[in-house]
Amino acid sequence: RYSFFPSFALAWNVSNESFLKDSDFINNLKIRAGWGQIGNHGIRPYGTISNYGISSDVQYGTPTNGISIPVLLNNIANPDLTWETTEQYNFGLDFSVLDDRISGTIDFYDKKTKDLLQNIPIPTSSGYSNILINKGDISNKGVELLMNFDVVSNDDFEFSFGGNIAFNRTKLESLGVPADDFYINGTAEQRSFFFGNNISRGQIFQSPANVFVEGEESSLFYGFETDGIYQSDDTDLVDGAVPGDVRIIDQNGDGIIDDLDRTFIGNPNPDFVYGLNLNLRFKRLSISMLFNGVHGNDIANGNLLTIGNATGQFQNVLSDTYYNAWRPDAPSNVHPRIGYNTVGDTAITDRIIEDGSFLRLNNLTIGFDFPVEKSKLFDRLNVFVMAQNLFTWTNYSGYN
């Protein structure tokens, strides 16, 4: 299938105009704007028609007279499939000042993708488990800033640094599914939503940790809020809890901890991502560093579902979890009692949600230029040492 995806862009180099051409301060100033569409057809060929394939799950005949492997329909045809289309507006500014010692770029964008290609589940009575359709719209809006500073530059000493930062906000504009009761802080709202897949195929996370809700950001963490550990003198134990259990908040106050008490417990989408670079040269010695970081994103740390709880007899746990577990003679408001059960939906709590922000020294290079003025063999001789992923600063307790 074919479609038409137009685009255009224009730019105005303001620094070439007569009123800026002779400026001693502004060296370059360019304003940019653009609009365009692009299509995504990231699906298998012939997705609009039924495809045939062999199946070893259904066999005819016997080992005596031979076994025939049939050719079956693999999917339901959908002749109404169309392109997933992304439309984007861009506005930007390029500039440099002070003899190009300070330069930068600012970009604003507004992107919307409609008619998302998705496999949705259908009743198995149809003979198939899913069908490919166009469903849902998603938008991304953001700003990106890039700056470079050439501070000092002479024969003996050079120093420059730069950085970039990007802010992006994603919104699920439409999911294409009927609205239903969705609970936030114990209150039901009519919202269109669906749950994500089980992380780790259900082996660690035994229920979905992410939810997609129309009007919200993508992939929000959805589960139970907690408030420490039940103590021996507590009289407000809920739904069979005993001292030493995690105190799960009964959002709707019905005395039962169930799915109606789930709410938003985290957001994996960062507030911003950023990078830094520094370059230093003193005579023949040079040092360069490259940092990258993410700020404001949450992570569901699945390690805390296993080694973070002293459950059962056949797995290791963190020493802090075991030695500081709640005990009648040594109560804790951080770690539950030994044997506390975290299986099922109630395992997805804010106790496993951690701040995933980090700053990483991604690359460090130290070099030295040896003098080669009298050499007939070399035009330049530089020896350097490079290290990657050298340090990471983060509060996240899982693997980096």
Language model features with spans:
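Conserved small-residue
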Residues: I133, D150-G266, Q388, N395-G398
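Membrane-embedded beta-strands that build the outer-membrane beta-barrel scaffold
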Residues: P6-V14, L29-W35, Y89-V97, I102-D110, ...
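Structural signature of outer-membrane beta-barrel domains
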Residues: R1, S15-E17, G36-G42, L98-D100, ...
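Flexible, solvent-exposed coil segments and beta strand-coil junctions
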Residues: R1, V14, N65-N74, I120-N130, ...
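Solvent-exposed loop/turn elements at secondary-structure boundaries
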Residues: K21-T85, S103, D107-I138
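Outer-membrane beta-barrel and related beta-rich outer-membrane complex signature
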Residues: D22-D24, Q37, H41-N51, L116-I120, ...
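Outer-membrane beta-barrel signature, preferentially recognizing the C-terminal barrel domain
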Residues: V58-S103, I131-N154, I204, G215, ...
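Extracytoplasmic gating/loop element in the C-terminal half of outer-membrane beta-barrel translocons
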Residues: Q231-D233, A241, V294-N382, A387-Q388
